[in-house]
A protein has these predicted regions:
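Extracytoplasmic gate region of multi-pass secondary transporters
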Residues: 10-69
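Residue-level signature of mid-helix packing/kink "hotspots" within the transmembrane helices
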Residues: 58-66, 117, 148-152
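Helix-to-loop junctions at the C-terminal end of transmembrane segments
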Residues: 64-77, 163
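Structural signature of the two symmetry-related core transmembrane helices
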Residues: 80-94
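Paired small-residue
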Residues: 92, 103-111
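Intracellular juxtamembrane helix-capping segments at the cytosolic ends
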Residues: 118-131
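A late C-terminal transmembrane helix in Major Facilitator Superfamily
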Residues: 130-167, 175
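Multi-pass alpha-helical transporter architecture, strongest
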Residues: 175-207
Length: 207
């Protein structure tokens, strides 16, 4: 059993864990993507500026997706790579709460884009590493389906809380909480994988 050998978990447990983790990161991811233009408008900047910031986020996300995941994934594996990108995403979502000057928002947009762009492409890598190769397509699709639900939930949370509070700050704080939830899950999987590798090496050394 590949998942048990590498993580000490059943195939189903790994599938469910990754699905839940994907919801956490994608709730956080969706908030700036869905509400950046409106948020910037609330800060006194025009819609054109908001659109430029959104375009900048998407452009830098493309850099991470096309180059960053391959670079880090080859060296550190899928779990550590997604931990890096999810950490960057969460950090700059938190920074967005306090960014009010335009240059600060541009800086946040660049680094948030670099972070979020590398998150979703890591899930197929992780599925391929830890789940049966013959089931990669189906299991990746299930994870991405849950991630899509997280995107929808994050977008809705942002709008619903804005209607109540008149600000996106609370929504961004909740998004950071979801991001931390994702990091805790991924960090736990990294810990389990490291422990399993040590156990295998100790078993080989004792023979």
């Amino acid at each position: 059993n590949r998942s048990f050998d590498l993580l000490g978990l059943s195939t189903l447990a790994v599938q469910i864990t990754l699905a839940i983790a994907s919801i956490g990161c994608c709730v956080a991811m969706a908030l700036p993507l869905a509400h950046m233009v409106a948020h910037v408008s609330d800060l006194g900047y025009d819609y054109e500026t908001g659109a430029q910031l959104l375009a900048l986020m998407l452009a830098t996300a493309g850099v991470s997706a096309f180059f960053g995941v391959g670079f880090f994934g080859k060296r550190y594996g899928g779990l550590k790579t997604i931990f890096i990108f999810s950490g960057i995403q969460g950090l700059f979502l938190f920074a967005l709460i306090f960014a009010d000057h335009l240059w600060m928002i541009y800086l946040v947009a660049i680094f948030f884009g670099l972070g979020y762009g590398g998150v979703l492409p890591c899930y197929p890598v992780i599925v391929r590493e830890f789940l049966p190769a013959s089931q990669v397509g189906r299991r990746t699709a299930l994870v991405i389906l849950c991630a899509s639900g997280g995107m929808a939930l994050g977008s809705w949370i942002g709008g619903a809380l804005y209607d109540v509070t008149g600000s996106y700050s609370l929504a961004f704080i909740i998004g950071v909480g979801f991001n931390i939830f994702n990091l805790v899950i991924i960090g736990h999987l990294i810990h389990r994988n490291t422990r399993q590798k040590k156990a295998v090496l100790q078993g080989i050394a004792s023979k």
